[in-house]
Amino acid sequence: MQVLPPGSTGGPSRLFILRPVATTLLMAAILLAGIIGYRFLPVAALPEVDYPTIQVVTLYPGASPDVMTSAVTAPLERQFGQMSGLKQMSSQSSGGASVVTLQFQLTLPLDVAEQEVQAAINAATNLLPSDLPNPPIYSKVNPADPPIMTLAVTSNAMPMTQVEDMVETRVAQKISQVSGVGLVTLAGGQRPAVRVKLNAQAIAALGLTSETVRTAITGANVNSAKGSLDGPERAVTLSANDQMQSADEYRKLIIAYQNGAPVRLGDVATVEQGAENSWLGAWANQAPAIVMNVQRQPGANIIATADSIRQMLPQLTESLPKSVKVTVLSDRTTNIRASVRDTQFELMLAIALVVMIIYLFLRNIPATIIPGVAVPLSLIGTFAVMVFLDFSINNLTLMALTIATGFVVDDAIVVIENISRYIEKGEKPLAAALKGAGEIGFTIISLTFSLIAVLIPLLFMGDIVGRLFREFAVTLAVAILISAVVSLTLTPMMCARMLSQQSLRKQNRFSRACERMFDRVIASYGRGLAKVLNHPWLTLSVAFATLLLSVMLWIVIPKGFFPVQDNGIIQGTLQAPQSSSYASMAQRQRQVAERILQDPAVQSLTTFVGVDGANPTLNSARLQINLKPLDARDDRVQQVISRLQTAVATIPGVALYLQPTQDLTIDTQVSRTQYQFTLQATTLDALSHWVPKLQNALQSLPQLSEVSSDWQDRGLAAWVNVDRDSASRLGISMADVDNALYNAFGQRLISTIYTQANQYRVVLEHNTASTPGLAALETIRLTSRDGGTVPLSAIARIEQRFAPLSINHLDQFPVTTFSFNVPEGYSLGDAVQAILDTEKTLALPADITTQFQGSTLAFQAALGSTVWLIVAAVVAMYIVLGVLYESFIHPITILSTLPTAGVGALLALIIAGSELDIIAIIGIILLIGIVKKNAIMMIDFALAAEREQGMSPRDAIFQACLLRFRPILMTTLAALLGALPLMLSTGVGAELRRPLGIAMVGGLLVSQVLTLFTTPVIYLLFDRLSLYVKSRFPRHKEEA
């Protein structure tokens, strides 16, 4: 047993140094817990930060946007507006469809929100039209969130109606049952139905009306209870042939008698098996298809949900005929997995680089092994805590662990370097470990808690940005905390067992060359430091200039919100003139699809035309462009978008808007471009006055591109102006007029066919092939009081007007959304400021309000809190350091190093052409924690030298700088190399990781050079200031 010198207590490390078995087993337990925890951690793109969002869709075929707004949307909005926890309510009412999107506060559980929505729908039921084909349907899904998976179902042998029927009953329902799936939509609208197309001339010749036909059909097809007979011996259930199942049966239906002869439906109408809505269509790579979009519930794990769907797909497709093919066109998890794999590789690369730099400085394998064990142990142990906190393996937590490699190795390096110094002086390894660990223990604690203090403000950030970075901050803090524990336990214990004078002195040619190089560097630094200390005011001027430069760079640097990712999927909107029909839009999408599929980067394409819950108007079409994997194409997504828009620009009468899908979805509406700005008024008339003015002003701004709005008030409308007196004289009510028009032109769902597996509709309409356009109104006939028929033209005048194609509300008031992108050379911050300046110039009245939406609104909130976030980080660190040092002065000396980090980070971002977004801001905040480590190591040793050796402040700080130069250089290079893989990232998701790496590498490079000289000067300045205060106020001295 070694005899320990007096004072070799080892501090908190003593017990662990003297009990190596217990220490080893404790570390093994941490390692095992981390390995087990890793197996249970889910994989995701980003932390779960989704707002609880519910979409309510109501379909009312044939209803105009005005009718949908007043009769459907408004009653629902009034009930929804009374729900607690509602953050925002938006609605879109178009021809035949009402979509209300409800976004709740982050703190409200989705299941609670669902209960409130269901109760509100129930309360509004009595206020809704009595002839709604279906009640409002709600889905726990954000409509702006892109599908996690898109499947195309095609067949070259079966009609699309049969294909959709099979997909709906055999595939879609099963996928809907998967945990995490919020909504499965079948785009294409080929739901089977019996279509009855009335011949207006035929029914008029027979003195019949469409209402007569409708009544006959609804009365002939019923499916209701008929009772049972209960006799003395047996019970008998009653049934009847009260249903008609096929078009042939309906064709033979007798609807009236003329002169004793039956008039069958087939005599006055074309009856056929068709689709429920003939104005819906979807195509996959230009082939007619049923496109199945699978959307997840807010908060659901996308990887687990997609894996479950993939597992069941083979079994589901086996139940389909061989002529029906199911193709997975897009799977967002493919890019998510690739991004996570790339980040994991960068993590391993960072570990390798850090270990390499350690060996370069220590030039000793045993000494390199010790931190080589500490780094993975600290990182793996973090996984155990992540499991208990319900975190996931995602880009941000992996980025935190990658950055942590440079942090966690710092503590081990400081301990090893200090213990090695004593061993080289001749101390026994055990005594050196006890003495070195005891001496450095306070420094480790200071480094750890001051660094964690920097992360504390991130935990208190509000709203979605705070939720986004909570996992990042906590993961990093846990890794740093475990690192401190390892450095005070395992590291000194291993030093006592693995290091010796012989091993440290054993050198080869490489070691001797490195040693000579380091000696020369330290000597050069010493000479430079001596000169700096002799000219303190020049150094202070440099420090002050650095502070001013930081402020200037902060003001001028382009600012953004979140990096635009290349996930390999592009969402698009095709816009045509407002009066465009379904047939013309189908033709236009074919032309556009042909151009898009010619691009070498495009792998597949789906297009959709028609009005449903996802597409508001007939003059717009939805596109989803799936790109080839990143390693199989030459261009990034923004270059592909520019190329596609150029290719389509020559097609007359269309405008194509494209934007890449993102993992972070804040919006609640599918937008044409990345950013949104709303104009809201109390009336539609006020909007119609100000929308053109604001749109023209925004389109003239160079900071904005592709400016458009969803305001469409030039749709063609036929106004039926009924002479109520004439109608009343003939016994015709307005209800009769509405019914006649609805029967003829509304694709009216008049009856339901029930089967064992599904329900199908009977659709009534006029056959307008021979009388297209407004001429079809001349064929409408109404039944008068005496039983005769009267043409509509006898009581009404037809006027052609303009009407809105859709009416949008935000929190129950009319609103228009302006969509825009930011052109190259400008930032989102530039665009936001330009819009605000334009708004002031227009001098909008008080009843007109504006607001940014989605990511632009989040950008404003994040930008407003950024400065306070950095101030909070500095204040938190000052408090921690003040408590640790029991001093008001020394924390200021340490914090004086921070402007150097800001200058380096901001300069690096500007040189790299990167914006100051929230990822880069997190990097700057982390730099605050890293850079101050240099000052802590210098000041700790300087104070100890003054206290224990009686040195003057100048001699103490000079010696401390030289003694700590090597560990400072080593720890800084370790942190720099830990961030270097992120800066040089090129794989999937690199856009997300690169700003963090750029900010940290730039900040470390500049701060490393400056703080080595500015810190000792500022230390001496504050020392003189302290002496001056004590001399002026002797009471302070006495109390001290």
From Swiss-Prot:
Any Pfam family hit: ACR_tran
Record's protein name: Multidrug resistance protein MdtB
UniProt entry keywords in alphabetical sequence: Cell inner membrane, Cell membrane, Membrane, Transmembrane, Transmembrane helix, Transport
Matches recorded under SUPFAM superfamilies: Multidrug efflux transporter AcrB pore domain, PN1, PN2, PC1 and PC2 subdomains, Multidrug efflux transporter AcrB TolC docking domain, DN and DC subdomains, Multidrug efflux transporter AcrB transmembrane domain
Subcellular location(s) per record: Cell inner membrane
Known partners and oligomeric status: Part of a tripartite efflux system composed of MdtA, MdtB and MdtC. MdtB forms a heteromultimer with MdtC.
Membrane-crossing segments per the record: 25-45, 347-367, 369-389, 396-416, 440-460, 472-492, 537-557, 863-883, 888-908, 910-930, 968-988, 998-1018
Entries under InterPro entries matching the protein: AcrB_DN_DC_subdom, Acrflvin-R, Multidrug-R_MdtB
GO molecular function, a single term: xenobiotic transmembrane transporter activity
Entry's family note: Belongs to the resistance-nodulation-cell division (RND) (TC 2.A.6) family. MdtB subfamily.
Membrane topology value: Multi-pass membrane protein
One Gene Ontology term, aspect cellular component: plasma membrane
Gene3D superfamilies tied to this protein: Multidrug efflux transporter AcrB pore domain, Multidrug efflux transporter AcrB pore domain like, Multidrug efflux transporter AcrB TolC docking domain, DN and DC subdomains, Multidrug efflux transporter AcrB transmembrane domain
